[in-house]
Amino acid sequence: MSSTHLPGGNQALLGCSATELESWAVAEGQPAFRGRQLHDWLYAKGARSFDAITVLPKSWRISLQQRGLTIGRLLEVNRAVAVDDTTKLLLATVDGETIESVGIPTQQRLTVCLSSQVGCPMACRFCASGKGGLQRSLATHEIVDQVLSLREAMDRRPSHVVFMGMGEPLLNIEAVLASIRCLNIDLGIAQRRITVSTVGVPHTLPQLAELAMKRLGRAQFTLAVSLHAPNQELRERLIPTACAYPFETLLQDCRHYLAVTGRRVTFEYILLGALNDQPQHAEELAERVRGFQSHVNLIAYNPIDDEGFQRPNPETIEAFRRVLEQRGVAVSLRASRGLDQNAACGQLRRQHAAIG
């Protein structure tokens, strides 16, 4: 291992395991315990700079900085807090890009919603994240930092993680899996409390199943597949990239994922007023997922300022849920949070860009 580079040739420490940091410290001519000290300051104490890690020899800290190594922390440039304490952070990367992360508190838990890319290439009609297209994928340390930044901002330890922010996680599989390993092992968040959401990218679900077993030993996180429609025609209207991924092929890949990992799949379905929220849509959806070891999570649409989609009324939402339940489908309704502070995915970033 090079004495001037971190594992994998990275320049940021965040994302490295205790074992990797110990081995790297030894390669740097330091005792192995220096690596354990680094690990403690990175993950338990949330250090933002080498200067803050005063237990390390000053000469080594200076050397690390001179060689361009960093902790890998991002800079908070904006914060929005809703009346229910839902907190959205706008974080800046070293190359000047911005990403969003959201903390969603309840009395029992703190769920953090993470971005996996800067922007998004999927261009879903109802989502703010894809309006500006994709700039790039995030590195592992940029994903992990979002959890630390929300922990600092909310002064509370996150208990659950969902990859439901900006970007398509399955177009950044390696960094997402590396960050899951870090969140699990280094930050102590159980895999079963981590959810990876995807709109569906051809050939990636089998790849995810295989890589998760290799990288993590076992895939215990939850896979959430965003359907948002009960048939191919309507799905293509809402998700342009769906034209390359037939509905039945997507479901077959979900069955393969279940067979390989033993983990049931969650199907996400955003309810759009008068478009996909009628009883006949619920009947068709129930027919699609019947007999599938799965769970359907309904999401009422969060309005975006310049879009024509509408949020269904509560009676329509309940009627849709009831149809699924009566057809034997396991179903839940996600509570909407942070509506008063532009906390829907991608909205704070768009607002910041418009001002800037």
UniProtKB/Swiss-Prot annotation:
Keywords: 4Fe-4S, Cytoplasm, Disulfide bond, Iron, Iron-sulfur, Metal-binding, Methyltransferase, rRNA processing, S-adenosyl-L-methionine, Transferase, tRNA processing
Disulfide bonds: 113-345
One GO CC term on file: cytoplasm
Alphabetical list of CDD domains matching this protein: Radical_SAM
Cofactor entry: [4Fe-4S] cluster
Misc. remarks from the entry: Reaction proceeds by a ping-pong mechanism involving intermediate methylation of a conserved cysteine residue.
UniProt-listed Enzyme Commission number(s): 2.1.1.192
Binding site for [4Fe-4S] cluster: 120, 124, 127
Keyword GTP-binding: no
Active-site annotation: 100, 345
Location of the Radical SAM core domain: 106-340
Top enzyme class: transferase
Annotated InterPro entries: Aldolase_TIM (IPR013785), Methyltransferase_A (IPR040072), RlmN_N (IPR048641), RNA_MTrfase_RlmN (IPR027492), rRNA_lsu_MTrfase_RlmN/Cfr (IPR004383), rSAM (IPR007197)
Cofactor note: Binds 1 [4Fe-4S] cluster. The cluster is coordinated with 3 cysteines and an exchangeable S-adenosyl-L-methionine.
Family membership noted in the UniProt record: Belongs to the radical SAM superfamily. RlmN family.
The protein, known as: Probable dual-specificity RNA methyltransferase RlmN
Subcellular location: Cytoplasm
Chain sites annotated for binding S-adenosyl-L-methionine: 167-168, 197, 226-228, 302
Reactions catalysed according to its record: adenosine(2503) in 23S rRNA + 2 reduced [2Fe-2S]-[ferredoxin] + 2 S-adenosyl-L-methionine = 2-methyladenosine(2503) in 23S rRNA + 5'-deoxyadenosine + L-methionine + 2 oxidized [2Fe-2S]-[ferredoxin] + S-adenosyl-L-homocysteine; adenosine(37) in tRNA + 2 reduced [2Fe-2S]-[ferredoxin] + 2 S-adenosyl-L-methionine = 2-methyladenosine(37) in tRNA + 5'-deoxyadenosine + L-methionine + 2 oxidized [2Fe-2S]-[ferredoxin] + S-adenosyl-L-homocysteine
Its job: Specifically methylates position 2 of adenine 2503 in 23S rRNA and position 2 of adenine 37 in tRNAs.
GO annotation terms (biological process): rRNA base methylation; tRNA methylation
